[in-house]
C-alpha cells in the first residue's frame, strides 16, 4: 500500500494506457507525469480505440499525444480539468500537428506553461505543464467567479526562472521557490 492506498488497481494486471481498463470512468481532475517521448507503445489493437476517435491515431513513434488523448478521454465532459507534464517537443512535433489543431479547435487547451530546464533529477530538458479544461465558460466554480475563457489559451514561459540552483549529487538542479510558484499561480488565476 502507498500511504494507505490499496495496491489492487483492477481485475487485470495490465497497462491501462494500452488496454484502457477504466472505460466509462470520468474524473473532475487528473494530474499526470507520463513518461516523456515513450517509444514502442503502439499495438495494432489500438487502431480503432475510442480514445482517438475525435482526434486521429497518435503516431506510433511517440506516445505523448496518446497520453494526452487518454487523459482527455477520462475527464468529466462537463467540467473536467487536467494538468500534466510533457517534454517541450510535444508543442511542435510535426507528426501530431493535426491532433494539436483539433485540441485547440475543440477548445480543450487552457494553458501551456514552459518550465525551466534542470527541474528533474533524471533529465536536464525543459518540460511543459499542459492544462486541459472541458469547460472554459465563465461562471461560478468552487466559490470563485471565472470569466469566459473560451477560445483563449494562456501561455507562460518560465524558462528564465533559474535563480534557485541546488547542487545535486552529480548535477546542478533548479528549484522553484514558494514565491515563484505563488506568482505563477496568481498569473494563472488572474487570467
List where the protein language model places each region.
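S-adenosyl-L-methionine
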Residues: 1-25
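A conserved structural/catalytic subdomain of Rossmann-like adenosyl-cofactor enzymes
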Residues: 23-191
Amino acid at each position: 500500500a502507498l500511504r494507505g492506498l490499496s495496491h489492487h488497481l483492477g481485475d487485470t494486471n495490465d497497462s491501462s494506457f494500452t488496454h484502457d481498463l477504466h472505460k466509462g470512468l470520468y474524473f473532475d481532475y487528473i494530474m499526470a507525469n507520463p513518461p516523456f517521448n515513450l517509444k514502442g507503445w503502439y499495438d495494432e489493437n489500438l487502431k480503432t480505440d475510442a480514445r482517438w476517435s475525435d482526434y486521429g491515431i497518435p503516431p506510433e513513434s511517440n506516445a505523448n499525444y496518446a497520453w494526452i488523448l487518454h487523459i482527455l478521454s477520462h475527464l468529466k465532459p462537463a467540467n473536467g480539468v487536467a494538468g500534466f507534464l510533457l517534454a517541450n517537443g510535444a508543442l511542435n512535433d510535426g507528426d501530431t500537428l493535426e491532433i494539436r489543431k483539433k485540441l485547440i479547435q475543440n477548445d480543450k487547451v487552457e494553458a501551456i506553461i514552459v518550465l525551466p530546464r534542470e527541474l528533474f533529477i533524471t533529465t536536464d530538458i525543459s518540460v511543459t505543464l499542459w492544462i486541459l479544461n472541458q469547460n472554459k465558460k465563465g461562471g461560478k466554480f468552487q466559490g470563485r467567479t471565472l470569466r469566459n475563457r473560451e477560445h483563449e489559451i494562456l501561455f507562460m514561459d518560465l524558462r528564465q526562472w533559474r535563480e534557485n540552483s541546488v547542487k545535486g549529487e552529480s548535477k546542478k538542479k533548479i528549484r522553484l521557490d514558494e514565491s515563484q510558484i505563488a506568482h505563477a499561480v496568481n498569473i494563472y488565476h488572474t487570467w
